[in-house]
Amino acid sequence: MSTTKLTYSSGSSAKSKHSVRVAQTTADAKLHAVYEESGESGDSFDYSKSINATKSTGETIPAQAVTAYLQRMQRGGLVQPFGCMLAVEEGSFRVIAFSDNAGEMLDLMPQSVPSLGSGQQDVLTIGTDARTLFTAAASALEKAAGAVDLSMLNPIWVQSKTSAKPFYAIVHRIDVGLVMDLEPVKASDTRVGSAAGALQSHKLAAKAISRLQSLPGGDIGLLCDTVVEEVRDVTGYDLVMAYKFHEDEHGEVVAEIRRSDLEPYLGLHYPATDIPQASRFLFMKNRVRMICDCSAPPVKITQDKELRQPISLAGSTLRAPHGCHAQYMGNMGSVASLVMAMIINDNDEPSGGGGGGGQHKGRRLWGLVVCHHTSPRSVPFLRSACEFLMQVFGLQLNMEAAVAAHVREKHILRTQTLLCDMLLRDAPIGIVSQSPNIMDLVKCDGAALYYGKRFWLLGITPSEAQIKDIAEWLLEHHKDSTGLSTDSLADAGYPGAASLGDEVCGMAAAKITAKDFLFWFRSHTAKEVKWGGAKHDPDDKDDGRKMHPRSSFKAFLEVVKRRSLPWEDVEMDAIHSLQLILRGSFQDIDDSDTKTMIHARLNDLKLQGMDELSTVANEMVRLIETATAPILAVDSSGFINGWNAKVADVTGLPVTEAMGRSLAKELVLHESADMVERLLYLALQGDEEQNVELKLKTFGGQKDKEAVILVVNACASRDVSDNVVGVCFVGQDVTGQKVVMDKFTRIQGDYKAIVQNPNPLIPPIFGADEFGYCSEWNPAMEKLSGWRREEVLGKMLVGEIFGIQMMYCRLKGQDAVTKFMIVLNSAADGQDTEKFPFAFFDRQGKYVEALLTATKRADAEGSITGVFCFLHIASAELQQALTVQRATEKVALSKLKELAYIRQEIKNPLYGIMFTRTLMETTDLSEDQKQYVETGAVCEKQIRKILDDMDLESIEDGYLELDTTEFMMGTVMDAVISQGMITSKEKNLQLIRETPKEIKAMFLYGDQVRLQQVLADFLLNAIRFTPSSENWVGIKVATSRKRLGGVVHVMHLEFRITHPGVGLPEELVQEMFDRGRGMTQEGLGLSMCRKLVKLMNGEVEYIREAGKNYFLVSLELPLAQRDDAGSVKFQASS
């Protein structure tokens, strides 16, 4: 599937991916239709040719045919015979569908034999109460049916009422009720007994999970190799492979472990049609898919005739394989398979999706782990362990993605430096004639500059004549775009693509002037592909006709023969950055002035950046000194150079006595000394540890305490050259909670005296039994969560109490659930976890942050009977500490990067406006025209000021520095009115202004730009929420004079912005005063403006009266007076 884009914004990637999936779903449906027709006509199905035919033909397939194909994939009406299926109405358990083998597997009488005797029903028909088919253990089914998240309760152990035969019931919800997949329990699994459920099965993957978590970061290949090894150890399949899906939806085998006599597939690439989009959607719904015997005839489903469509089997573990897939498995010698989805986070993913490719919001299918076996095989209970293993694998992949994002960020910073370095040379020729050059920006085989009808070529490129032809084609067919990227010039419609051959297939083009371009070129993908599999005989005529991995590889090579590797978003962002700088810097600028202009801009940005760093540093010092969390800092040798008031208070050691002392040798207990040395060593290497426990010595008035126990985060301190010069420790005092918890974990008798004690020193405690059901919920946990003990006891801790759906205590996402499950499983296996970051939403929807410690619970014999969890509350102190930590040098540097980019992009057109205004000021203007120009100037100044507001926290926290300059009130009012004119005219509203002449001519001291910013925002909101039928909006200014100390006069200003109608929505007013539950864009603007007024020692009210509403802004500003010489002074009293 070719990808061609006319824009370079990575924000468009989600839309592009969605389009690719929709197109691929159509191709899947066409290929399936060809396969079905070949079966009906008796013709053999040539897989390779069919794939190419669906790609090359221009025929479209009706939407109804695509829908029918998707319906057949999900509602095929067939199940595998190794188990049986029941579908029931939720609540009543009335059977609405069953597989035709259900009666036999459950040892029920045939339907044709009438039920005799007491009316007890021993037959299976539509309408049967499914609960009557099982023993009393069926109560577990009823309990599961009431759960929001059924997955944590699966598999459920049940027994046939007739024969006591045990089954695993895997239950899930569908549109018309519940589906129960019943799989017979193997003799080897009878040791599990009724102790089924996810928590029990997860123990089977404990070793594999431990190994995954112990792997070093930065090596996805090693991660995949380890996963396939562990899956084979757990499941025993002959062949285990890890598939990765690429951006263009095709797949690649990236890891493999196999029986020595089986054919290798490592390195195999296969076309996207090998795993249809509909199948990928099903993997998102049902993450583990088992085929016990692909050659076994499937079993039909009988269902209630009242149902409008066939039962959905999208989430069923028994869904039968489609004929083409069974044939594919047979051709590769596989009889049984187990496929597990590898799902990761993806912020670019939209929710839902067209065709079969829709995916869950924020999640995407990264790849699959596929197991094959040469004989029939099923692993019922192990499947849940494998699914959990895949969740942990996804978590590790997400961590690797975070590392990759960090590397990408460094790459972007390096690229921006490289771009600026290029611009300091002869522009634009230096970016292709010197080293580094534009080929160093992105991975490519060649690059070219077409500038002023001249050519500069690097690497493998088209000829000069061909490049000129491509440029003319772009100008003619893509004249409205600023460039184009494609992995196939042929598919993009370039008529001369065939003449370029395989050497030039993909292209990224960036327009730098009206007729000049930068080009990057890539050769065909096939030269990048290496397959370690068996070489097939080219004379084997049947090789391409079979559905087999070799034919898939052959088809893939055919598909990508004239296509390059796709261009990644990060590469296009780098190209786009260069394009923006070149377009803004060189278009219509004389070469002789280029260096001067660039040096001036770079120096301007550098000075601004240093000022911002200085501001951040000053605020950091203030925050640290006044923080209510204990904060200390050491230099690179480990000597104290920071000791705030809180840590001095809890230790009893004044700051004057702490400064200069060794933290490791003098201030911590001996048992923490090694940890301090380790933290210091790691931080100096740039590795910052979190949630580490330190025990500080006590002094003076605190000497009676044994120690002060802090949980700290280490943060490296850096100088302006980015060198690490020390370490800052931001901590939380957990001394009281730690003492209580230590006593609790050592207690040998009845623990309830401590757990149920309402003493505030007792931390929140909850627990689970060995099956995962909540067994403890103490008063502190009741208070913290808002849920009473009797409401949660006996419910599944994960899935019913903590989860991501409508749970009692909702977690933020699937990753949070997986991490919590890992902690619980580790504790149940005897491995305690301390200070694990844990957060959930309480009963009122408040987000609670804490540190969790999980420990095993054992009986008198030492057998593990469950898990206890203790929470260290993320107090206001910790919250403030985290805020301080976030405001470190990393934030400052990040801010500099953002400012440099945004200013470059937005200030360029602003410079154009300023230049135009400057030209106008040199011409003969009337008084009105001069006023218009002056109004434009103060509006420009307002834009520049807003562009500088990168850190809204400084406004929210009240420490933004305001400018104090002399200004004329009339100029402010002109600027405010001008910003409301266009919107008011669009709504046919008259803007009524009441500003007395003496106020217009009044000179005041204050922050003119901030004043006009807030007044304009209030005015525009008034206009926005005034119906056109009301005809008017008004702004009125009233003043009164006050005298301070007999010297300075202060003007009390009252601005009343009035509008008729119902007024602003109440939710928006609440947001303005920070009382709303959320924050819209308009609410954020109003809130910031209210805080700016407060910074100016003013107040804002929003008042509703009969038929009208108004903003009332009150503030006081010093009055200025001009003398005859034009200088300004404060107006003194007469």
UniProtKB/Swiss-Prot annotation:
Domain PAC: 690-746
Domain GAF: 219-401
Record GO terms (molecular function): phosphorelay sensor kinase activity; photoreceptor activity; protein homodimerization activity
Modified how: Contains one covalently linked phytochromobilin chromophore.
GO biological process: detection of visible light; red, far-red light phototransduction; regulation of DNA-templated transcription
Binding positions (phytochromobilin): C324
Domain Histidine kinase: 901-1121
Keywords: Chromophore, Photoreceptor protein, Receptor, Repeat, Sensory transduction, Transcription, Transcription regulation
Keyword S-adenosyl-L-methionine on entry: no
Alphabetical list of InterPro entries matching this protein: GAF, GAF-like_dom_sf, HATPase_C_sf, His_kinase_dom, HisK_dim/P_dom, PAS, PAS-assoc_C, PAS-like_dom_sf
Domain of life of the organism encoding this protein: Eukaryota
Domain PAS: 616-687, 750-821
Record note on quaternary structure: Homodimer.
NCBIfam families hit by this protein: sensory_box
Family, similarity comment: Belongs to the phytochrome family.
Job of this protein: Regulatory photoreceptor which exists in two forms that are reversibly interconvertible by light: the Pr form that absorbs maximally in the red region of the spectrum and the Pfr form that absorbs maximally in the far-red region. Photoconversion of Pr to Pfr induces an array of morphogenic responses, whereas reconversion of Pfr to Pr cancels the induction of those responses. Pfr controls the expression of a number of nuclear genes including those encoding the small subunit of ribulose-bisphosphate carboxylase, chlorophyll A/B binding protein, protochlorophyllide reductase, rRNA, etc.
PANTHER family in the cross-refs: OS08G0260000 PROTEIN (PTHR47876), PHYTOCHROME 1 (PTHR47876:SF3)
Protein name per UniProt: Phytochrome 1
Source species of the chain: Selaginella martensii (Martens's spike moss)
